[in-house]
Amino acid sequence: MYSIAALCIALAASSTILTSCEDDEDKTTTEVSGVLENGSTISGDITSNTTLAEGYEYKLSGGVHVKEGATLTIKPGVKITAIDDDTPDYILIEQGAKIDAQGTASNPIVMTSETPENKWGGIHICGKAHTNAESGSGSSEIGGAKYGGSDDKDNSGTLRYIRLEYTGFALDEEHEANGISFYGVGSGTTVDHIESYKGGDDGFEFFGGSVNVNNMVSFDSSDDSFDWTEGWNGSATNILAYQMSAEDDCLIEADNNGKNYDAVPVSRPTIKNAILIGNGGDGRGIRLRAGTQVILDNVVACGKNMPLTVETGQTETALKNGDATITNTTISANLNSKESIYTNEDFIKEPTNNIDATGITIEAAKGLNSWLNESWIVLK
């Protein structure tokens, strides 16, 4: 059996509205393109290449849609603050548009709200990769933008060294904003070193697509830390989920398609080098259901009464026959099987899997994974 320690070691444009003001002067609104001024308020559509300059601070008001053919560039050290009002403030990258948001470990990009209670709308990326939703396409939950297609290598840009704080705007009782929502995002998109911090919904959610993500942190997301559906078949490598409240939902919630468990292409991502820490309560840690498949390797899941749950015949059968696999994985209590097809006995029959009630703390995780000590990450 692998010990927990061994497991963890591996582990604005022409139509953009810009508002700026000087002391003792009324605010003025002008249309801009190119590099936006320090202190500007960003709102509306971006239809040509637009840059937020290094170290500048900006306000975000309402939905900002980056339109096809345009690129929104965000330089290191930029801080974007969502205005506290009743309007959903969010950034949405439409099909054919790109975002180039590259912070650094010492100078990350920070997107936040005026107060922790003011939940804002996060980032939404709509690509041209597959979704197994009916008709092969869909509309984003916030912003109503089209996503889906057949280009699994589609490139929506680059996101690196970004911290998103206090997302989770409630559009209605059914729809709240994630830190980042990936809608049909292709593998040509680069995503690494991203933190969702104290969001009011999921940290990161994948709706189909083939995007691969690395070095991702979901800290105290009040719903699911990581969530996928609609046929996502990319990968997530070096990830941390940490929950402070026992009321938080799943550390990973995974579906193929909630309306059609047999929809194709089937969700089958690779999750490798993952530390998933709950904080008590009766919730589930990893919840595999609705026909999803998965490759889980080198994972620790603890801090939940049910750290690993498998549901639905399609999901459990895939695990039983090897279409889905769980290896090098330690959970803090027995696996829970709803259909009794893939059982706790099957889990421990794999010699690299283990059940260890000890679990792991956030401090231990930091001690075993040097990247979690980088200054761009907040873990308190």
What name fits each language-model region?
Residues 1, 10-40:
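Bacterial Sec-dependent N-terminal signal peptides
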Residues 26-72, 83-96, 103, 112-201, ...:
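Extracellular beta-rich repeat passengers
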Residues 2-3, 217:
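Jelly-roll (double-stranded beta-helix
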Residues 107-108:
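Glycine-rich loop(s) and the adjacent beta-strand/alpha-helix scaffold that form part
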Residues 79-80:
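Short active-site-proximal "capping" loops at secondary-structure junctions
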